[in-house]
C-alpha cells in the first residue's frame, strides 16, 4: 500500500471510529446532565447557561430537560464552535437554546438571567478568573446556583497558556475553585468527588 492510500485508509478509520463513538458520548452527556439537573433542581421553565458549550451536547441535553418553557444559553469563545452551535440549533429546531459569544473576562449573559449556570471542564481555562467570576455572579438570579465540574492538575498535560500560576498544571485544585468563587460572593453548598471520569463537582449558591 502506498503512502497516499495508507493515509486515506487511516483517515476513513478515524472518521468511522468518531461516528461510532458519538452515540455513546451523547448518552454519557445526557446521563451527566440528568444528575446535574437533579442536584440543581431544574424544572420545566428553568433558565440554564452552559459556559463553554463546545459541541453543544450538554447544552442540548439540558434543553430537553427544561422544556419549551425554559431556556438554555450556550456560550462559546471559539469562532468555529460558535458557528457549529448555531448551525446545530437551527438544524435541530431548538427554539429554547440561545447561542452567545462569550469573552475572556465576561460571560456576555444578561444580568440576573439564570436560575443555574454550569461550567464543565472550562474553569481551568479561564485566564481572567476574577473578572469572569464577577460576571458569573451578575448573571445569576438571587437564589441561583453555579456548578463547576473540573479535574485536579494531571501529570503529562501542558498547563493552559495564560492562566494563573496557582493552577499547578493542566486542571485546577478543588480548593482554589472554592476559594475564588466564595471570594466572588457565592456560598459553597456541596462538593462531590465521585463525578464521571475522575472529575469533581462543586455547587455554589447566590444568596
Regions found by a protein language model. Name each.
Residues 63-67, 130-145:
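A short glycine-rich, Lys/Arg-flanked "PGG" loop and its adjoining helix->strand segment in the class I
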Amino acid at each position: 500500500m502506498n503512502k497516499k492510500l495508507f493515509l486515506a485508509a487511516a483517515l476513513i478509520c478515524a472518521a468511522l471510529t468518531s461516528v461510532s463513538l458519538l452515540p455513546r458520548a451523547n448518552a454519557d452527556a445526557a446521563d451527566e446532565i440528568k444528575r446535574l439537573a437533579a442536584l440543581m433542581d431544574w424544572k420545566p421553565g428553568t433558565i440554564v447557561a452552559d459556559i463553554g458549550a463546545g459541541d453543544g451536547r450538554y447544552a442540548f441535553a439540558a434543553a430537553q430537560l427544561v422544556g419549551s418553557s425554559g431556556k438554555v444559553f450556550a456560550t462559546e469563545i471559539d469562532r468555529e464552535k460558535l458557528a457549529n452551535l448555531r448551525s446545530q440549533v437551527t438544524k435541530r429546531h431548538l427554539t429554547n437554546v440561545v447561542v452567545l459569544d462569550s469573552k475572556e473576562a465576561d460571560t456576555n449573559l444578561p444580568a440576573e438571567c439564570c436560575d443555574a449556570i454550569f461550567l464543565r471542564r472550562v474553569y481551568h481555562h479561564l485566564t481572567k478568573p476574577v473578572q469572569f467570576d464577577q460576571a458569573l455572579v451578575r448573571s445569576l438570579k438571587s437564589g441561583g446556583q453555579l456548578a463547576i465540574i473540573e479535574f485536579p492538575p494531571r501529570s503529562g498535560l501542558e498547563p493552559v497558556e495564560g492562566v494563573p500560576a496557582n493552577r499547578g498544571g493542566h486542571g485546577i485544585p478543588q480548593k482554589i475553585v472554592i476559594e475564588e468563587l466564595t471570594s466572588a460572593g457565592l456560598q459553597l453548598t456541596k462538593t462531590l468527588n465521585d463525578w464521571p471520569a475522575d472529575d469533581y463537582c462543586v455547587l455554589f449558591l447566590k444568596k
